[in-house]
Regions:
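Interfacial/gating helices of multi-pass transporter permease domains
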Residues: 24-50, 109-110, 203-207, 211, ...
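Helix-loop junctions and terminal segments of transmembrane helices
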Residues: 53-71, 132-134, 244, 248-261
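C-terminal transmembrane helix end/exit motif
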Residues: 60, 127-134, 138, 158-162, ...
Length: 261
């Protein structure tokens, strides 16, 4: 098989392996957690997902599409993502009380403040994962995704079994991001240079802007219904909706994601 075909196979394994792990973990955790736990995490994940869209900002796709991206390009995006993610986290941190008030669920205040840390962690992975995909090293991407998910699931099940409730789901999201980052660093071993170029940022943004708009609108449409349900109904109803919607869309989204890569 050619390199492109092999890469496609590994991208397929990455997405469906992750989907399979998610399915199995949901079956196990459904016996350990309550619907309102899933509802609470679903309410705040809406804001995390949309914020993550802005962190990537289409720069990952722009770097992949660019014929010969330089060290300056990669370093510029790396530093920009860090600063921007910190800014987003600060905004979310101070908006957390208002979001909790919007949903009439005080617990969300602390949940969002803690979970928001994944924005900063994820920002450190953008360039690393982009470089691996640029080199068609989808096997390494698959390892990073599946292994990080597996480790996080094991810890989450342990925490849920010991009565951590919704916090086990928060820790799961953080651990997935941490393990993914560590594995990307292990497989890629790229270190940014001490350089930042506004010219490179502008050039990449001109292409990435359209990808950003597309991703933002897609995520907004996918999550707006959950936002309304979370506001109008209880966290239990939100939890049931979140889990059913996840089961309904996960496989189709995985197929689309493989093709996009």
């Amino acid at each position: 098989m050619g390199k492109v075909t092999i890469s496609f196979v590994w991208a397929f394994i990455q997405k469906f392996g992750n989907t399979f792990l998610s399915f199995i973990s949901n079956i196990i955790l459904a016996r350990l957690l309550l619907p309102e736990d899933y509802g609470a995490i679903g309410m705040i994940m809406i804001f995390i997902v949309i914020s993550n869209t802005f962190i990537d900002g289409g720069f990952g796709s722009a770097l992949i599409q660019k014929t010969n991206p330089t060290t300056k390009d990669y370093s510029t995006i790396f530093y920009w993502n860090i600063f921007f993610s910190i800014g987003l986290y600060i905004v979310l941190y101070f908006c957390a009380p208002f979001i909790a008030s919007f949903y009439k669920l005080p617990l969300l205040n602390n949940l969002l403040k803690v979970l928001g840390v994944v924005l900063i962690i994820n920002s450190l992975s953008v360039v690393q994962s982009t470089q691996l995909r640029k080199k068609l090293k989808f096997k390494e991407c698959a390892y990073a995704t599946v292994i990080s998910s597996l480790l996080a699931v094991c810890v989450t099940v342990f925490l849920a079994y010991n009565g951590m409730g919704v916090w086990s789901l928060v820790i799961q999201q953080i651990l997935v991001s941490v393990f993914s980052l560590l594995l990307y660093l292990y497989f890629n071993k790229w270190i940014p240079s001490l350089v930042f170029s506004w010219k490179s940022l502008k050039e990449l943004f001109n292409f990435g802007f359209f990808m950003l708009c597309s991703s933002f609108l897609n995520n907004l449409c996918n999550n707006i219904q959950g936002l309304i349900i979370g506001r109008q109904f209880s966290s239990t109803v939100m939890g049931l909706y979140t889990q059913s919607a996840k089961l309904a869309t996960e496989s189709s989204n995985s197929i689309a994601s493989v093709v996009d890569q």
